[in-house]
């Protein structure tokens, strides 16, 4: 127990408040017991007290919540200290804090009163009306494709709310609404993942959503809808465009998430977000938004080799599992991948532990199996850096997970579901099989090549054809290198004992006929050639051709 001295110098013990107001209980803040308390005065909350209920028996340890760590006093104290530092840095919050001390009833709101000399009036460009692009029947059809393909993995929308918004939007077709960017993005993704020829207005829907979202980055009011729409735009760009475009969109998403305060649980929200926070946000929806945005930004940044957006004062808890979607499985996989952050100085044992955790995941959606496989291949690349001697057991497990991803990619291609890893996993898996360069790994090259060719037939884009030609040339390079090694061995046997020339010739012929060598390629290599596999292991294959309007569609 800590000791303090009063004005007379006598030592006194710190007294815990005998009661706490309902606001401090809800927000898990320390209450001084006054009515109104200091915390409620500071943040202009209504301060109310209720009589103490009768004491109940203590709950058993087995009934502790999964989020016990987030609710621990140490965690709450750490978050509280972080927020105090942020508020102390903020010049926009200080006038409010000063006003609360001088006159709690008339304190100014948190606002950038002297941020600059005043904003310029910017002309508002008229947006294309959604109802002029597609009919209600088309919107409902595209939304059904979205809910079938995208929603199970990235469940950031409530299906019932989406259907209600569609009905309301076409009930008043002339009036634009803040939900329009979501509807445009849902329609565009539904067109992309429909499995059919794209809707003729898909490009216009993407452009309309982009124009509306660009205004959210400079608007005074940011809503939950804007963060949701930015997530949907990131998914669309990750599926169709270059790495830079999807990375920029994912970073913008994270900044919108911070603006609405979605990275902090409602009971722990900081004063600095009071001018932009969306107070109407449902707790569970907010948590799903934050975690899905974090997954997208982190994984895109890792794969692209860029910095991710790291928010301060994060207190948002993971969402709860929900029937009909696998978003919590996605988040669990992301939490494992945090080990692979470039700033983490992982030992070999850490990476092997991460691989074991990836293996233990039981996933039922093919898009998640692709991500699981990609995570395993990433761990292999990190293992190559951490150690030059990877055990055969680890290599076998990597190959098994890579093959699972390959099979999932083929199934998704047959289902006409253009998830981005449908192209990337086969290409990366083939590169890693050649880099491992064991009899077991090389035995998978043939089936993997056949699968990649099948995927290329399903999605006949120049990008995929180029990727296929590249990996085939790498296989030929590996084949030629082994043939040259075989020639050296044959020649060495002939030079050692001329009398065994005939026998050596027979042996070399048997090797040449072996199925694992394949046909002789038309590429020649210098004697001292040694291929740098890291160049190809770090290469990402975009699903569509990079383009200004979202890339070339499959045919």
From Swiss-Prot:
Reported phenotype of the disruption mutant: Impairs the production of kojic acid.
Stretches for region Disordered: 51-73
A GO CC term assigned to this protein in UniProt: nucleus
Transmembrane segments: none
GO MF terms, alphabetically ordered: DNA binding; DNA-binding transcription factor activity, RNA polymerase II-specific; zinc ion binding
GO biological process: DNA-templated transcription; positive regulation of metabolic process; response to xenobiotic stimulus
Annotation: DNA-binding region: 21-47
Function: Transcription factor that regulates the gene cluster that mediates the biosynthesis of 5-hydroxy-2-hydroxymethyl-1,4-pyrone, also know as kojic acid, a by-product in the fermentation process of malting rice that acts as a chelation agent. Mediates the expression of kojA and kojT via binding of an 11-nucleotide palindromic sequence, 5'-CGRCTWAGYCG-3' (R=A/G, W=A/T, Y=C/T) within the target gene promoters.
Biotech / industrial applications: Kojic acid can be used for several biotechnological applications, including use as an antibiotic, as an additive to prevent browning of food materials, and as an antioxidant. Kojic acid is also interesting as an inhibitor of tyrosinase. Finally, kojic acid has also been shown to have strong nematicidal activity.
Native source species: Aspergillus flavus (strain ATCC 200026 / FGSC A1120 / IAM 13836 / NRRL 3357 / JCM 12722 / SRRC 167)
Keywords: DNA-binding, Metal-binding, Nucleus, Transcription, Transcription regulation, Zinc
Protein name as it appears in the record: Transcription factor kojR
Domain of life: Eukaryota
Subcellular location(s) per record: Nucleus
InterPro entries: Metabolite_Synth_Reg, Transcription_factor_dom_fun, Zn2-C6_fun-type_DNA-bd_sf, Zn2Cys6_DnaBD
């Amino acid at each position: 127990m800590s000791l303090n001295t009063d004005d007379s110098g006598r030592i006194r013990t710190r007294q815990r408040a005998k009661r706490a107001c309902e606001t401090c209980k809800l927000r898990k803040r320390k209450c001084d017991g006054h009515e109104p308390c200091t915390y409620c005065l500071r943040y202009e909350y209504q301060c109310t007290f209720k009589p103490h209920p009768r004491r109940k028996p203590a709950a058993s340890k087995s009934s502790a919540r999964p989020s016990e760590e987030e609710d621990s006093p140490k965690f709450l104290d750490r978050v509280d200290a972080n927020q105090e530092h942020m508020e102390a840095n903020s010049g926009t919050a200080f006038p409010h804090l000063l006003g609360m001390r001088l006159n709690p009833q008339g304190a100014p709101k948190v606002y950038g009163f002297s941020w600059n000399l005043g904003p310029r009036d910017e002309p508002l460009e008229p947006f294309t009306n959604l109802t002029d692009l597609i009919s209600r029947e088309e919107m409902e059809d595209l939304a059904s494709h979205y809910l079938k393909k995208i929603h199970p993995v990235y469940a950031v929308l409530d299906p019932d709310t989406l259907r209600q918004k569609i009905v309301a939007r076409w009930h008043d077709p002339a009036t634009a609404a803040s939900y329009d960017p979501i509807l445009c993005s849902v329609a565009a993704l539904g067109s992309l993942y429909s499995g059919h020829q794209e809707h003729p207005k898909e490009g216009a829907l993407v452009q309309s959503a982009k124009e509306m979202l660009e205004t959210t980055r400079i608007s005074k009011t940011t809503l939950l809808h804007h963060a949701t729409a930015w997530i949907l735009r990131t998914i669309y760009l990750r599926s169709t465009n270059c790495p830079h475009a999807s990375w920029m969109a994912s970073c913008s998403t994270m900044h919108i998430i911070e603006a609405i305060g979605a990275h902090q649980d409602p009971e722990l929200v900081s004063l600095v977000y009071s001018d932009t926070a969306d107070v109407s946000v449902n707790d569970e929806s907010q948590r799903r938004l934050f975690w899905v945005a974090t997954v997208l930004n982190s994984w895109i940044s890792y794969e692209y080799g860029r910095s991710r957006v790291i928010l301060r004062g994060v207190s948002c808890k993971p969402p709860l599992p929900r029937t009909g979607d696998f978003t919590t499985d996605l988040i669990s996989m992301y939490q494992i991948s945090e080990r692979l952050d470039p700033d983490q100085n992982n030992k070999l044992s850490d990476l092997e532990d991460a691989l074991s955790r990836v293996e233990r995941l039981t996933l039922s959606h093919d898009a998640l199996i692709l991500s699981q496989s990609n995570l395993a291949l990433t761990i292999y690349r990190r293992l190559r850096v951490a150690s030059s001697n990877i055990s055969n057991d680890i290599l076998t497990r990597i190959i098994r997970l890579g093959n699972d991803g390959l099979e999932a990619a083929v199934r998704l291609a047959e289902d006409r579901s253009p998830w981005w890893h449908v192209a990337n996993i086969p290409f990366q898996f083939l590169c890693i099989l050649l880099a491992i360069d064991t009899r077991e790994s090389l035995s998978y090259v043939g089936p993997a090549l056949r699968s990649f060719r099948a995927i290329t037939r399903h999605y006949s884009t120049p990008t995929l054809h180029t990727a296929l030609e590249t990996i085939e040339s790498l296989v030929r390079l590996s084949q030629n290198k082994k043939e040259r090694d075989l020639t050296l061995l044959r020649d060495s046997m002939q030079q050692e004992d001329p009398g065994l020339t005939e026998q050596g010739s027979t042996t070399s012929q048997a090797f040449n006929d072996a199925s694992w060598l394949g046909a002789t390629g038309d590429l020649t290599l210098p004697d001292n050639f040694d291929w740098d596999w890291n160049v190809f292991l770090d290469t990402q294959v975009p699903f569509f051709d990079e383009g200004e309007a979202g890339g070339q569609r499959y045919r």
